[in-house]
Swiss-Prot record:
It comes from Bacillus cytotoxicus (strain DSM 22905 / CIP 110041 / 391-98 / NVH 391-98). It catalyses: L-aspartate + NH4(+) + ATP = L-asparagine + AMP + diphosphate + H(+). The keyword Transcription regulation does not apply. Belongs to the class-II aminoacyl-tRNA synthetase family. AsnA subfamily. GO terms for biological process: L-asparagine biosynthetic process. It is an enzyme of class 6 (ligase). Keywords: Amino-acid biosynthesis, Asparagine biosynthesis, ATP-binding, Cytoplasm, Ligase, Nucleotide-binding. This is Aspartate--ammonia ligase.
Length: 327
């Protein structure tokens, strides 16, 4: 039966250790400045992240003006707009401590309706919009993960060390070719188990099979220049996503992806006009799950062991039987 390596109190202390170390190193190594993040945005701005395109945001109207607002899903688009508004230049970037509510999330051991992540974004030059630059950035972030594991091992040696020396790279098409008989999720399990840490490149577009590896909104990542960081989770014995990130759409890729997604109506939104008219800067960015990070590095079996959220009664009961104590 599962046994947590830490008490609840010890876990809370270790969570702060994880978040403080990672935040400090993320800012230093990517050259990012911390900024305040919004909890909600106006509906008409088009700044909310619509994720896979089907999740419903929480909407409400403001008494003062009657304007319709949405609780953010993430700050994928807001960050790019903020870089423009704040006058950042190529090579400079920002990050935020983002909190969101995703009402349509399917709850399980790794998914909660409460989302907390380091949302970051950095301005790039046109010639940097390459797979090579994407991989270079992934390696930088992976280096922080490696150093975090070493840092925690010094304080809590019983946590062990599991990450390989380097992160592997594979495209979603290569992954499908390698495991044609498996579902996309099963492919992720297989490749993460093989390498321990892997970045899957190119998520959102249709593969040669006619299926997508996974859905991605058409209006922030360039589907050829994005991907997910996956680890093999030693407790869950499954693949475990730590981050989705990518080089963002330029005017050409946004034009193509909106048409593919059947979302040409978004061309009238302020944010989308800013990209199509080359007003907003070219960027790279992503989200790094804070609770996911704590869950992996503290060797937890359920995300509810590292964050406070709401869970169905039947899930709480099932967790109790497995000796999993949710916050």
């Amino acid at each position: 039966m599962y046994q947590s390596l830490m008490t609840v109190r010890e876990t809370q202390i270790a969570i702060k250790e994880v978040k403080t170390f990672f935040e400090d190193q993320l800012a230093k190594r990517l050259g990012l400045f911390r900024v305040s993040a919004p909890l909600f945005v106006t509906k008409k701005s088009g700044l909310n992240d619509h994720l896979n395109g089907v999740e419903r945001p929480i909407e409400f109207d403001m008494l003062h003006s009657g304007e319709e607002l949405e609780i953010v899903h993430s700050l994928a688009k807001w960050k790019r707009f903020a870089l423009h508004e704040y006058g950042y230049e190529a090579g400079e970037g920002l990050y935020t401590n983002m909190n969101a509510i995703r009402r349509d999330e399917e709850l399980d051991a790794t998914h909660s309706i409460y989302v907390d992540q380091w949302d970051w974004e950095k301005i790039v030059q046109k010639e940097w919009r390459t797979v090579e630059y994407l991989q270079e950035t992934v390696r930088t972030i992976y280096g922080i993960f490696k150093d975090l594991e070493d840092h925690l091992f010094e304080k809590y040696p019983f946590l062990g060390k599991y990450l390989p020396e380097d992160i592997a790279f594979i495209t979603s098409q290569e992954l499908e070719d390698k495991y044609p008989e498996l579902t996309p999720k099963e492919r992720e399990h297989a490749i993460a188990k093989e390498y321990g840490a892997v970045f899957i490149i190119g998520i959102g577009d249709v593969l040669r099979s006619g299926e997508k590896h996974d859905g991605r909104a058409a209006d922030y990542d360039d589907w050829k220049l994005n991907g997910d960081i996956l680890f093999w989770h030693p407790v869950l014995q499954s693949s475990f996503e730590l981050s989705s990130m990518g080089i963002r759409v330029d005017s050409q890729s946004l034009d193509e992806q909106l048409t593919k997604a059947g979302e040409d109506f978004k061309r009238d939104y302020d944010f989308h006009k800013g990209i199509l008219e080359d007003v907003l800067p070219l960027t790279i960015g992503g989200g790094i799950g804070q609770s996911r990070m704590c869950m992996y590095f503290l060797r937890k079996a359920h995300i509810g062991e590292v964050q406070s959220s709401v869970w169905p009664d039947e899930m709480r009961e099932a967790c109790k039987k497995e000796n999993i104590h949710l916050f």
